Amino acid sequence: MSDVRSDKPFVLAGRTFESRLLVGTGKYIDMEQTRLAIEASGAEIVTVAVRRTNLGQNPGEPNLLDVLPPDRYTILPNTAGCFDAVEAVRTCRLSRELLDGRNLVKLEVLADQKTLFPNVIETLKAAEILVKDGFDVMVYTSDDPIIARQLAEIGCIAIMPLAGLIGSGLGICNPYNLQIILEETKVPVLVDAGVGTASDATIAMELGCEAVLMNSAIAHAQQPVMMAEAMKHAVIAGRLAYLAGRMPRKLYASASSPLDGLIK
């Protein structure tokens, strides 16, 4: 019998997903590249900036849902571009109208244009309103374990701390805070922002994150479709490594083969 820990399902808002890679839809050169990259990623959940993307609110313009049909993908509307709770709540309510009453949203309330750090005070306000309004809230936040705990206590269904600045590609800047969040939070934790290449995604999964969300790392790669496939395998590898359990770190060497019984 294998001693590898068996995996548990990845569940969000009562739905089970096979892929632990979530992807965004921005920054691609056109919708065809968007479609090809997302197909290559194997992602089932696709996040969309409601304020920047036509989901049917602008008749006559290309509709992203024609390329990424909701019967194939779970569309996760997000509040990118919102800088206070009022804007974010309004955007979530618009998304519910556009997506036939679906309540799953990704909340992000930004502090400024330069850093795109989350405004945690406004995020907490918006989260409380949205949860009371019946939304299933996945929330972008800082890597502060106390804020993460408060958001979970409000009723957010997933906590999404940044690993680095949005679009920076800096990788996992503070794995220690992420570890604390993972230990202290009882809802799924997904790394959101900062991933730059496949090894970053693997590290996030090895830490124990339920999943990883990314956009720039794929869309800004020299070959986005190829990078999307790389990220697919990176997330799988990281999850398997987490379940298997890494060997302990040691200060000194340890021979792979025993020294007893050597031929003399």
Swiss-Prot record:
Catalytic residue positions: K106
Catalytic activity field: [ThiS sulfur-carrier protein]-C-terminal-Gly-aminoethanethioate + 2-iminoacetate + 1-deoxy-D-xylulose 5-phosphate = [ThiS sulfur-carrier protein]-C-terminal Gly-Gly + 2-[(2R,5Z)-2-carboxy-4-methylthiazol-5(2H)-ylidene]ethyl phosphate + 2 H2O + H(+)
Residues that hold 1-deoxy-D-xylulose 5-phosphate according to the record: G167, A193, G194, N215, S216
Pathway assigned in UniProt: Cofactor biosynthesis; thiamine diphosphate biosynthesis
GO molecular function: thiazole synthase activity
GO BP: thiamine diphosphate biosynthetic process
GO terms under cellular component: cytoplasm
Coiled coil: none
Cellular localisation: Cytoplasm
Keyword line: Cytoplasm, Schiff base, Thiamine biosynthesis, Transferase
Enzyme Commission identifier(s): 2.8.1.10
Free-text function comment from the UniProt entry: Catalyzes the rearrangement of 1-deoxy-D-xylulose 5-phosphate (DXP) to produce the thiazole phosphate moiety of thiamine. Sulfur is provided by the thiocarboxylate moiety of the carrier protein ThiS. In vitro, sulfur can be provided by H(2)S.
Subunit structure: Homotetramer. Forms heterodimers with either ThiH or ThiS.
HAMAP family according to UniProt: ThiG
Family: Belongs to the ThiG family.
Protein name per Swiss-Prot or TrEMBL: Thiazole synthase
Species: Pseudomonas syringae pv. tomato (strain ATCC BAA-871 / DC3000)
Lineage: Bacteria, Pseudomonadati, Pseudomonadota, Gammaproteobacteria, Pseudomonadales
